[in-house]
Amino acid sequence: MAVQQNKKSPSKRGMHRSHDFLVNPSTAIEPTTGETHLRHHISPNGFYRGRKVLKTKADE
């Protein structure tokens, strides 16, 4: 079992944990429909960068 050699001070503990926060994923707005979607992903309507690239059930 691992045993620490020296106690980590509160300051060093905070510095160690400084990158453990969660970040919201960046989103983009589709210019044709105005819907938000993940960047570099197809919008729910099947549009990507202003072009229809996927048929959806609503199209049929």
From Swiss-Prot:
Residues 49-60 have a biased composition (Basic residues). InterPro entries: Ribosomal_bL32, Ribosomal_bL32_bact, Ribosomal_zn-bd. GO terms for cellular component: large ribosomal subunit. Residues 1-60 are annotated as: Disordered. Belongs to the bacterial ribosomal protein bL32 family. HAMAP family: Ribosomal_bL32. This is Large ribosomal subunit protein bL32. It comes from Bordetella petrii (strain ATCC BAA-461 / DSM 12804 / CCUG 43448). The gene is rpmF.
